[in-house]
A protein has these predicted regions:
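Short alpha-helix
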Residues: 245-266
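A short glycine-rich, Lys/Arg-flanked "PGG" loop and its adjoining helix->strand segment in the class I
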Residues: 184-199
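A short acidic, Gly/Pro-enriched loop at the edge of an enzyme's catalytic core
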Residues: 156-171
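Class I SAM-dependent methyltransferase Rossmann-like catalytic core
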Residues: 11-83
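Class I SAM-dependent methyltransferase SAM/SAH-binding core
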Residues: 93-94, 99-154
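Conserved class I S-adenosyl-L-methionine
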Residues: 199-236
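A short SAM/SAH-binding and catalytic strip from SAM-dependent methyltransferases
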Residues: 168-184
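Conserved Class I S-adenosyl-L-methionine
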Residues: 253, 266-349
């Protein structure tokens, strides 16, 4: 059983000096890096393995896939429902693949051959992806990797590039759609590449409830960096596209909203699930750093100002982000913030 307690602004005021120290540490750690490098380095805090599970010592069954978030714990079973029953010799496109850990966990237990093409802008992550599948899934082929962002991939396909196979049996996009300049364009692209009966497995943190999105929007608005509100629109466009209202949606609402947004009817919404996921850190410095796992370090380069802003927001409004400290469970003695995610399975007809 997990027990946690919310932290108040009054309690955090007594630790103002700790926040200043963490701000200085982060400035030293992240200074001089590109936006993508900052994104990758801070994201690594999420993917720290559970040492008990890593060494097979979680005999009580409380081991977790990542210490930094329960998103993978909740997502992997949903991905497995589709990936484990794909036809032999099927093809999968893994967009924003990272190092492949999530997809690898979802494929545990599959013995039939499968081909996966991962796409990610970070070359190191793609090399790790290939090494991981070569070691853990020898029956699954990674015939090639694509070092690219989403927009670049779509532009290449429009230009007539033969970068991709003719079709895929599944397209995975786990927390990568934020980096597309057009959510409707991305979804249409994914549906175009699917074989009839294939599924788009889309995962994203709700624009209306996520810590990272809230921090990015607040920062841009405070310093007047998005006068036309383009970022706010992009942060909420996915919520609007799937019919998310007041934090909930249904398959029928989602389907109706997607029909309108995409102006096509060759799909059906197979499943839509909101998962009450969280992100976890060992100290308050981790919690500040988590604001950089999204677009914040890419859309503005003033790192010192960004760090100070995030730190101040956390201290003044911890209840807005449901900042907590855990006293029991697999992540005891860790801090956490609310970062709900939504899983959407769309089948091509």
């Amino acid at each position: 059983m997990t027990v946690s307690f919310p932290l108040t602004a009054a309690a955090l005021r007594e630790h103002a000096s700790d926040f200043r120290a963490y701000e200085q540490q982060l400035a030293l750690e992240l200074g001089g890096l590109s936006g993508l490098q900052i994104n990758e380095l801070t994201f690594a805090r999420l993917t720290k393995p559970d040492p008990l599970r890593l060494f097979g010592l979680d005999g009580d069954g409380e081991g977790v896939l990542m210490l930094g978030t329960d998103q993978r714990d909740m997502l992997v079973p949903k991905l497995s429902e589709t990936l484990l029953v794909l036809p032999p010799e099927g093809y999968v496109l893994d967009i924003g693949s990272g190092d492949g850990q999530t997809t690898s966990y979802a494929l545990e237990g599959r013995s039939e051959p499968l081909s996966i093409i991962p796409l990610d802008p970070m070359e190191d992550s793609l090399r790790q992806y290939q090494d991981l599948f070569r070691t853990r899934h020898p029956e699954i082929s990674v015939p090639r990797v694509i070092t690219s962002g989403i927009d670049e991939l779509i532009e290449a396909q429009i230009a007539g590039s033969d970068t991709l196979p003719e079709y895929f049996h599944a397209v995975i996009s786990a927390h990568s759609i934020y980096f597309s300049s057009s959510a409707p364009g991305f979804l249409s692209f994914a549906l175009d590449r699917l074989h009839p009966g294939g599924k788009l497995l889309l995962v994203f943190a709700e624009g209306l409830g996520r810590f990272t999105g809230g921090m990015t929007l607040g920062y841009l608005e405070k310093y007047g960096l998005d006068p036309e509100g383009k970022e706010r629109s992009s942060q909420t466009v996915l919520d609007q596209m799937i019919g998310l209202a007041n934090g909930t949606t249904s398959r029928s609402d989602c389907h109706a909203s997607l029909l309108k947004a995409l102006a096509r009817n060759d799909f059906r919404v197979a499943e839509v699930v909101t998962q009450p996921t969280r992100i976890y850190g060992h100290d308050l410095g981790d919690m500040i750093a988590f604001a950089f796992i999204n677009k914040l370090p890419i859309i503005d380069q003033n790192l010192t100002r960004q760090i100070a802003y995030v730190s101040q927001r956390l201290q003044e409004s911890p209840d807005t982000f449901d900042l907590r400290v855990h006293v029991s469970g697999p992540r005891a003695r860790m801090f956490s913030l609310a970062q709900p995610q939504l899983f959407l399975a769309v089948e091509k007809l």
